[in-house]
């Protein structure tokens, strides 16, 4: 009797680590070749962060948020590989990313989610242009394999770019951009460089995508495909994740020794990609749409990621106030700083929520697209306010976070006792807890890791200039002009094509109404069990 095979099981964090041992990528870190990515201490904090996205999918408290049912297969998949088909799905994704980044600072796997959405939209667009179904079927087969194997995909989008004043085909060195060097009946061969690839060493596969809108002369550079991380001809030159095993000025890094992020420069040297893994190969006129789709999804997701980091700063700031002997609720100067920090974090996160609620179904695919205005406003706010977030954490904490004696003094019999007595601020908080809170904030905001969070917040997902461009491109300025001209009872110009009225946004605050959120709606969020018990 024939029986159906059971559906694939979602991996745990331990399964993910073990799966990495089945790959043999060519990875260099700090000038040495890595024998086993899964076992290398320099990469462990990054692997820990990704592993948490697997473990949370198995915890009853988090599983409703961290898993979803894939409509095209009916299977339960990890939220990070699921395609959103409603505004509720976008909200669930937002909360899931905030959850995992509260624990890890940056869980990285959400890039998989964003890239799969962009390629789904691209594939449907290509099929509609050709009148066929080949691209959609190809992508769906790949998607189901990724979901069934519970893979983590890296996004290889940012090219080395070379001379920024020249287009890809004009570069003196063509390998500053990834491009197609050969086509045959079995697939394509690509060469070139992707300069900034998040988590590259400990991904299962890389999704190669164009980083800009290509012209007809750049057709060979318009390429999107999936490449196993250990493909022949691929070399990854990476930096360590976090600060594993490194003694800093104020002791071991309390957070970044556990969680961090590696990035890698990916060098492609005649890497063969079979056609079933190719999603764009020379269709230059669609490259800009792919880049735009990914950027919109990713900028909304970044909002949630940095809100999770903001939660860490809010909690650490409140702890430091307490350790210093103050109740921020009773001290106006501290309360004002804490409320400003909360306002920043929840303010840009609210833009992510709005981007979900006002999201729209893609005109070609079944997936939902976040509203680009709110997605870009939220990302712009977090990019520029990350420095204020650090400043506020520093203000409520005091200078102790960078002036503490080193941890060796904690064990020096000639100084430890006296330091414990004189550096204790509150009778209710032991000295050891005060210095631990101080060193935690130092790690997050005032050391290497703090600078790293600032830069990835500013430039990750695109520069502030790119976000401002998208906000202006999509914001309905024309509707506002019409409003004022109607109140003035006359138009200032009879030209309907004048520049300031080109941008219009149907469906929001207009006759057609807002787009329906769709189903399923947002799942119930996990409750804080500690808070519930104390209440």
Enumerate the predicted regions with their spans.
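Buried hydrophobic positions in well-ordered alpha/beta secondary-structure cores of metabolic enzymes
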Residues: 31, 190-192, 268, 338
């Amino acid at each position: 009797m024939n029986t159906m095979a059971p559906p694939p099981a979602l991996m745990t964090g331990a399964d993910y680590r073990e799966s990495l041992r089945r790959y043999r990528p060519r990875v260099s870190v700090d000038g040495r070749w890595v024998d086993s990515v899964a076992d290398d201490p320099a990469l462990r904090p990054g692997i820990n962060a990704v592993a948490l996205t697997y473990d949370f999918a198995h915890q009853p408290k988090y599983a409703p948020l961290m898993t979803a049912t894939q409509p095209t297969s009916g299977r339960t998949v990890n939220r990070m590989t699921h395609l959103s088909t409603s505004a509720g799905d976008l909200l669930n994704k937002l909360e899931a990313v905030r959850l995992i980044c509260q624990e890890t600072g940056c869980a990285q796997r959400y890039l998989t989610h964003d890239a799969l959405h962009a390629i789904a939209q691209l594939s449907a667009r290509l099929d509609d242009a050709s009148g066929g179904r080949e691209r959609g079927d190809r992508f769906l087969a790949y998607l189901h394999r990724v979901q069934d194997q519970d893979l983590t995909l890296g996004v290889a989008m940012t090219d080395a770019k070379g001379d920024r004043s020249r287009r890809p085909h004009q570069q003196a060195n063509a390998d500053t951009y990834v491009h197609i060097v050969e086509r045959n009946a079995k697939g394509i061969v690509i060469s070139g460089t992707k300069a900034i690839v998040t988590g590259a060493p400990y991904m299962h596969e890389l999704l190669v995508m164009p980083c800009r809108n290509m012209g007809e002369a750049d057709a060979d550079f318009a390429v999107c495909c999936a490449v196993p991380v250990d493909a022949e001809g691929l070399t990854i030159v990476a930096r360590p994740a976090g600060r594993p095993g490194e003694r800093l000025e104020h002791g071991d890094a309390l957070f970044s020794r556990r969680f961090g992020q590696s990035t890698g420069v990916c060098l492609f040297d005649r890497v063969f990609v079979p056609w079933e893994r190719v999603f764009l190969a020379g269709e230059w006129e669609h490259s800009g749409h792919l880049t735009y789709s990914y950027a919109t999804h990713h900028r909304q997701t970044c909002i949630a990621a940095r809100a999770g980091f903001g939660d860490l700063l809010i909690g650490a700031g409140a702890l430091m106030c307490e350790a210093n002997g103050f109740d921020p609720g009773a001290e106006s100067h501290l309360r004002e700083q804490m409320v400003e920090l909360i306002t920043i974090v929840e303010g840009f996160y609210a833009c992510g929520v709005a981007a979900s609620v006002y999201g729209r179904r893609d005109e070609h695919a079944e997936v939902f697209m976040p509203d680009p205005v709110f997605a870009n406003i939220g990302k712009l706010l977090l990019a520029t306010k990350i420095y204020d977030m650090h400043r506020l954490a520093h203000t409520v904490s005091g200078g102790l976070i960078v002036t503490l004696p080193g941890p060796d003094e904690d064990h020096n019999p000639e100084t430890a006792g006296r330091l414990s007595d004189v550096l204790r601020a509150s009778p209710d908080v032991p000295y050891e807890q005060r210095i631990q809170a101080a060193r935690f904030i130092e790690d997050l905001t005032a050391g290497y890791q703090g600078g790293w969070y600032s830069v990835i917040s500013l430039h990750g997902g695109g520069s502030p200039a790119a976000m401002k461009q998208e906000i202006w491109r999509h914001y309905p300025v024309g509707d506002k002009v019409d409003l004022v001209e109607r109140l003035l009872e006359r138009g200032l110009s009879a030209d309907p094509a004048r520049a300031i009225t080109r941008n219009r946004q149907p469906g929001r605050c207009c006759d057609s109404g807002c787009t329906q959120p769709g189903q399923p709606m947002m799942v119930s969020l996990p409750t804080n069990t500690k808070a519930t018990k104390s209440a």
